[in-house]
Design a protein with these regions (language model features):
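Short glycine/threonine-rich loop/turn motifs
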Residues: 31, 37, 41, 54-139
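Short, glycine/charged-enriched hinge/interface segments at domain edges or termini
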Residues: 1-58
Length: 139
């Protein structure tokens, strides 16, 4: 403990920052959802979970599996002032999945991809830097 105190000097070893209000954009991918073949049942759940925190969902888009449109939708939310963008709609281990490429094409720095959350479901965390802010993009 003495070494930790010495290393920190007069500053605390760590601090807990207050949670700030966040604007969130939701990009729901998947051609099945866009075509209306399946109902998007996750966005209402996601909005409910986000409502437990001081957030505002500034919009939702459904670009299907069009990689360029996924990228454009993410960037549109960032340009509208989103503090976070969540991509939902079935990102998977499927090599044809367009969501990871759409996120990468924003220029965001992908910090993790491939951690299976459920069998067949994947997690991607990326950060887009704009005007000194790191905006998380989750997929």
């Amino acid at each position: 403990m003495d070494r930790a105190v010495e290393a920190a000097g007069p500053e605390p070893i760590f601090s807990i920052l207050p949670y700030h209000f966040k604007k969130v954009g939701i990009v729901t991918t998947g051609s099945e959802v866009k075509k209306g073949l399946i109902q998007d049942t996750f966005t209402p759940v996601l909005k409910e979970k986000l409502s437990e925190y001081p957030t505002e969902v500034i919009g939702q888009t459904t670009p299907g599996d069009d990689k360029a449109q996924i990228t454009d939708d993410i960037m549109e939310f960032i340009n509208q002032g989103a503090d976070m963008v969540v991509c939902s709609g079935g990102m998977s281990v499927d090599p044809d999945d367009r969501t990871p490429g759409g996120i990468r094409d924003t220029g965001a720095r992908v910090v993790t991809y491939g951690a299976p959350v459920l069998p067949g479901a994947m997690l991607l965390i990326a950060y887009y830097e704009k005007e000194g802010k790191c905006i998380p993009i989750l997929g």
